[in-house]
Structures are given as C-alpha cells and as structure tokens.
C-alpha cells in the first residue's frame, strides 16, 4: 500500500496527546495512521539549514523537521506568506506589502524544502501539501522529476480575480498551482474563484465538471469543508467545571452570556463586532443589566503594525462602550487579550447562551463548529454566524448575518437572546447532524480517497498534454 507523505509549514509534535488539541493535527494523524508515512515540515526553530533532518518515528509514522535561517524565515514566512498572501486571500489588498526580496525568499524556501524532501520519497508515495505557505511546492517537486500523485488543500479563502490579479506574481502562482493533481478548497465559492482566476489568464479545458487542463497540466478541483472532532469536544465541554469557572457561572446565574473567541486578526471582524454590540445596547435597552458579552482575543503576530492597531482599537472601544452603558454592578463587555486553555474554552462555550462568530472573511472557522458541538442538546445556545465564514455553507440553521451590518447583527443577537427553547433545540440538532457527518476524519478520508483515484503522472503523458494545449487567444 502507498505511503502518505504530509507536508505543512509546521508539524505537530509527535505526542498524540498534545496533537489532539488541534483539529488539523487530529485529521492528519488519522490519515497517517491509516496508511503509514511521513509528516514533513519546519521545526519551528531557526538555525543552520544544512543540519540533518530531525527524525522521530512512532509506530508507522515518521516526523521529519528542519530549521530555517533567520533570513529565510523572515522572507518566506513573515514578509511573503503573512504580509502578502494572508491579507490578499482575506480581501485586504490595503494591507499587502509586496517586496521582491520576499517573493524570492518564498520561492527559495519552497525549493529548499523540495530538496530536503526528495531523498525521503518513494515512487508510490501519495503526497498531501497544506496551505498558502506552500503554493509552489508541487512545481518544485515536478522540476526534480517527481511524478507522484500530489494533492493540495487550501485552508484559507481563495480570492476573486479582481483581488488575486492585483498580486504582482499572480500569474506565476497560478501556473505553479496547476502542478498539483488535486486542489482542495473549503467552499465551492473558493473553487470557482480559483478557476475564474485561471480562465482570465489562460485557456482552461474542462473535461468533466471538476477535471481540468491548463498549460498542458491535468488537475482536478474539489471542495472539502474541514471538520472537527464533535465527540471529543462534547466530552471536554460536559466535564466538571474548574472551581473559578463554577463560581463565575453561579455569579452570572441570571445573566445571559454572549461569547466569542478568535485570534487577534483583522480578518475576524472584531471592531465591527464591538460596534454591533453597542447597537444592541442602544436599540434594545431591555437587555441592560441582563447580558454580558465576553470577547477573548489572544495576540497574534504582535510585531505587525496592523495587529497592534486592532488591539489598541479594541481596548479603546471596550472602554468607551463600558463607560457609556455600564452600571454599578454591571459591566456589559469583557475584552480579554489573553490565551486560554482549549478545554476550558469548550466548557465556556457550553454555558454561553449565544456564540458570536462574525469574521469578515474566513476559510471555514472551526470555532463556529466547536461552539455547536459543545452545547447541551437539551438546552443549547444560539450561533450567530457571518455569511462570509466558510462554515455558513454548512451551518445554515445558525442566524446568518452580514458582519458589516451592525443593525442586522444587533437584531440577530436580540433574536438569539429571546429565542424559545424549542427553536433552539431544533436549530442545534440540524447543525450538530451536519457536524457529526462531516467531521475531521470524513474530511481527510474524502481527500485521500480522491487523491488515490488519480492516475500518477508520467513524463510522457505530460509532454503529450503539452503538445495538445494552446495558449489562450487575446
């Protein structure tokens, strides 16, 4: 049976208990255990790139990691992946900081990784690449003669041509992506956006609905919405509360809780969320003294100015809103710029009456799914969800809102706070059914199954396809 080789920017430590804290790690480990294989990625450390790979083997899985130099890490990861691709793919061209040296570093590191992986590959390996850090990776492997089946999954949104084509190197990136055999996206909108970008640049031949050829390269596109571990989350949420949390729950017995947890990131719509909550307090005064909104937003990329600006903005808005609407004995908004243990968050989800998840743009947003999975089915909370989160395509029984419309979000919060138990139970049951069916294992099994169905490339077939392909006419 073919081995599975997984490549990601970072690898989870070879400690199953630690890895289980993150959904992606669970899915990847499940796939690796089923097939046996290798997880290859950056160690998280800077140092001499020429050092031998660090290898750890447990059972039928090998972890192989490498160091990056300070320059390579800065150019590949900070300056290009996170200062160009991340904002552009989240529709924030105003925050893109394109620099040629960073682009060169991005390509250089992808080539370096291909060189390091090449000696580890076997002829029948199936290779699965993850996320925007590694868009050119298949191209680098093909240049080195690798004809194995290579799949790619994009965890973040794929932008429309108007956005993507603004990147100075968009044409190169698109052609490199076509070196993958299978391109997986979170939503159908993302898949179609990619094909639109491609069609604007070159002639694309579509043999069936999701099988295409461009630049003589045959590839398939498909949608694989990533899932979670609902049973594990329900187990964590239902366990006994720590003493401090139990005390807080008792103190807030007659207060309805609106809860959000997100990384401090401009894509998450946190300032817009605060302002929508202010509209709720202004237009629905009957809730004064009876609700509390808690926003947990741990610092992410704190050395980047755009992230510093959001943190200062949230601090100012929280103080202003509390100063305007707060009363003796009642603080309407709690903003915590801190990290909390994942298991504790699941318990907080369970006793929260409303889960507020309103990103401006998000590939999926697993927090929304985790909130649903953490609820008590007999007395569940209500999910208020942005239409621009990938999860909105599946969780259609949530209260779907436009995060840019403060009045709509405020009205949804009022509806959630006053919703009947029967409606809450019905909506929750519908969403939980979707989450259980499309869990993290279903996600990885579908992707790997589809990748296995693809006939491996050969040098002869690639050359034959090139002869039969013509450039797009002007």
UniProtKB/Swiss-Prot annotation:
Give the main EC class: transferase
Q: Which InterPro entries does this one have?
A: Glyco_trans_20, Trehalose_OtsA
Which terms does the record give in the GO molecular function aspect? alpha,alpha-trehalose-phosphate synthase (UDP-forming) activity
What are the entry keywords? Glycosyltransferase, Transferase
Among Pfam families, the record links this protein to: Glyco_transf_20
Give the source's domain of life in one word: Bacteria
Q: Where does UDP-alpha-D-glucose bind?
A: 22-23, 263, 268, 340, 366-370
Q: State the EC number(s).
A: 2.4.1.15
Sorted alphabetically, the Gene Ontology BP terms of this entry are: trehalose biosynthetic process
Give the protein's function.
Answer: Probably involved in the osmoprotection via the biosynthesis of trehalose. Catalyzes the transfer of glucose from UDP-alpha-D-glucose (UDP-Glc) to D-glucose 6-phosphate (Glc-6-P) to form trehalose-6-phosphate. Acts with retention of the anomeric configuration of the UDP-sugar donor.
Query: What is the protein named?
Result: Trehalose-6-phosphate synthase
Gene symbol of the encoding locus = otsA
